[in-house]
């Protein structure tokens, strides 16, 4: 009997069977980073979890169109550039490169499409024009705002009462708004800020419209799955629905909405505003990235995850045992075969804790097995179970010889990329400082026609 993927759809608050609109080309959109600073480990939970989902969809359907955006125009980016006295592109190029390196270190496969907001200004402007033409948006004092009252279903994702939402918005209401709950699609830019010519004057897009336009451009008006952190459910995802469905004649924007829970640190939500973050960049310099990935998958994605050094240590110890089992099976030839119980666990709303329990069970059986056929079967299943979760893909010798500093290569590569971005922006002081930092660590840089290479002295 074919396996059936079931996912918790936050739109309906139910676990439902998933079937794509087009089985030959399922679509997945995940909200990506705003590249103004290092990503913290809480920011990595979604990419890791939805990396497991993307791999599952590819196995099941043979294809996938997966987009995860880069927000490279935002007031936080502007503030960071002004504070550091550097061009905005220096900030966005640097942190986009670091983000990609950090995700690669965690074993996250790049999405098929990684659209950047600044490369989609014409599409954003066109969508805003469509919303104005259909009376769902209006221009006022160089701004364009979405008229929330024009969309009867506003609030259907977050289940918030529209009157309560509007009441909460009545603090310091901008005079150009017709209604306190109306949100910005386009805003004017002063000469010192990034901006583009538009029918409403020089300006830049609001955050919400960027994702709507990029999703429609690359995946069409209706996508199968939209995913992101639960903190984005309102207002970001609610506003995406309103914009997209009004711009496309009422067509459903996303059929399934998946939201991952937050990471807690010492009992409080991990966030930059609270100052209790641990960056991926720092963590992969101190711990094997695979242990961080394991830790992120250790709780069900919809539940909060309590992050601690103890959790990381537990993940390291577990991986020591699993790689030790594979090392003991070094004399057995086997190719990865994903076991049915692991697929069944992932089919059950991405139940990664159950899948990891199956990994432990298989490893336990493998350690006891004496029969050659059983050992080969169990090694194949252990490799396959790891493959489904993005784990156990190193050689055991590599894990044990470099486990303590497995993230170092990714950290060095990120610094090399950061130096290249600094040179491009003519920030030579920063570029020289990075070169010196690497030299102090015994890393030699070689500028070649193909780019910068590095090696240990």
Swiss-Prot record:
Its cofactor is Zn(2+). Its EC number is 6.1.1.16. GO terms for molecular function: ATP binding; cysteine-tRNA ligase activity; zinc ion binding. SUPFAM superfamilies: Anticodon-binding domain of a subclass of class I aminoacyl-tRNA synthetases, Nucleotidylyl transferase. It is found in: Cytoplasm. Binds 1 zinc ion per subunit. It comes from the Bacteria. NCBIfam families: cysS. This is Cysteine--tRNA ligase.
């Amino acid at each position: 009997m074919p396996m059936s993927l079931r996912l918790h759809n936050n739109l309906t608050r139910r676990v439902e069977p998933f079937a794509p609109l087009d089985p030959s080309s399922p679509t997945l959109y995940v909200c990506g980073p705003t590249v103004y600073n290092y990503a913290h480990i809480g920011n990595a939970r979604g990419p890791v979890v939805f990396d497991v989902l993307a791999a599952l969809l590819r196995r099941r359907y043979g294809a996938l169109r997966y987009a995860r955006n880069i927000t490279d125009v935002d007031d936080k980016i502007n503030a960071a550039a002004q504070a550091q006295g550097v061009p905005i592109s220096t900030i966005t190029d640097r942190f986009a490169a670091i983000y990609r390196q950090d995700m690669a270190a965690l074993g996250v496969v790049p999405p098929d499409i990684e659209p950047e907001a600044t490369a989609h200004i014409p599409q954003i402007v066109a969508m805003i024009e469509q919303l104005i033409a259909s009376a769902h948006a209006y221009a006022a004092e160089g701004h364009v705002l979405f008229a929330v009252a024009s969309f009867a279903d506003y609030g259907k994702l977050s289940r918030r009462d529209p009157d309560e939402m509007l009441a909460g918005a009545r603090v310091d209401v901008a005079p150009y708004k017709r209604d306190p709950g109306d949100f910005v699609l386009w805003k004017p830019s002063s000469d010192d800020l990034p901006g583009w010519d538009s029918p409403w004057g020089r300006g830049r897009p609001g955050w919400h419209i960027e994702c709507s336009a990029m999703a429609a451009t690359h995946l069409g008006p209706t996508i199968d799955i939209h995913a992101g952190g639960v903190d984005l459910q309102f207002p970001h995802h609610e506003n995406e629905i309103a914009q997209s469905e009004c711009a496309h004649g009422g067509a459903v924007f996303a059929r399934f909405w998946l939201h991952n829970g937050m990471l807690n640190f010492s009992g409080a939500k991990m966030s930059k505003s609270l100052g209790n973050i641990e960056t991926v960049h720092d963590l992969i310099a101190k711990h094997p990235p695979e242990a961080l990935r394991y830790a992120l998958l250790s709780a069900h994605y919809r539940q909060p995850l309590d992050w601690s050094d103890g959790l990381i240590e537990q993940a390291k110890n577990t991986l020591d045992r699993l790689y030790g089992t594979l090392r003991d099976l070094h004399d057995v030839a086997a190719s990865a075969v994903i076991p049915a119980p692991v697929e069944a666990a992932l089919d059950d709303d991405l139940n990664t804790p159950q899948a990891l329990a199956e990994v432990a069970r298989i490893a336990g059986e493998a350690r006891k097995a004496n029969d050659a056929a059983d050992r080969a079967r169990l090694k194949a299943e252990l490799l396959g179970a790891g493959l489904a979760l993005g784990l156990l893909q190193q050689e055991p010798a590599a894990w044990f010889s470099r486990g303590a500093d497995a993230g170092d290569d990714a950290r060095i590569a990120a610094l090399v990329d950061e130096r290249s971005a600094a040179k491009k922006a003519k920030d030579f002081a920063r570029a020289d400082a990075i070169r010196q930092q690497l030299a102090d660590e015994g890393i030699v840089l070689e500028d070649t026609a193909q780019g910068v290479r590095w090696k240990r002295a």
